[in-house]
């Protein structure tokens, strides 16, 4: 999502293209905090200006999202702990439950052996 919000070039273009047809973005409840953390890191590393980060945060706040709590997915997230982070596991567990494809640019998730859903990079 951060790529789609602020990254120029092919990575950002792929993210924006993948998100464009979606009316509602289905995400874990932590989505806003996670994106904010990613933007903060980019600003601290000098990869993003404060102004562009503020614009991206406004986009996140205005995005139509369906947010899901952690608790219903906790057991599955725990099962995935050996191959991906808890945070990534939440996205995987949610995609599995929704019987949908998880789009991610995260190589660790793309190459993980635990997910039962399709995991693909945005194209």
Q: What is each PLM-predicted segment?
A:
Residues 23-25, 65, 96-101:
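Short active-site oxyanion
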Residues 27, 86-89, 104:
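Short beta-strand scaffold positions
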Residues 4-5, 38, 112-113:
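Residues that scaffold the ATP/ADP-binding catalytic core of kinase and kinase-like folds
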Residues 29-32, 52-82:
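Acidic catalytic patch
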Residues 80, 92-123:
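Acidic, PIN/NYN-like endoribonuclease modules and their adjacent C-terminal/linker elements
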Residues 1-31, 42-51:
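Short, well-structured N-terminal submotif of metal-dependent ribonuclease cores
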Residues 1, 31, 73, 91, ...:
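Alpha-helix capping/helix-boundary segments
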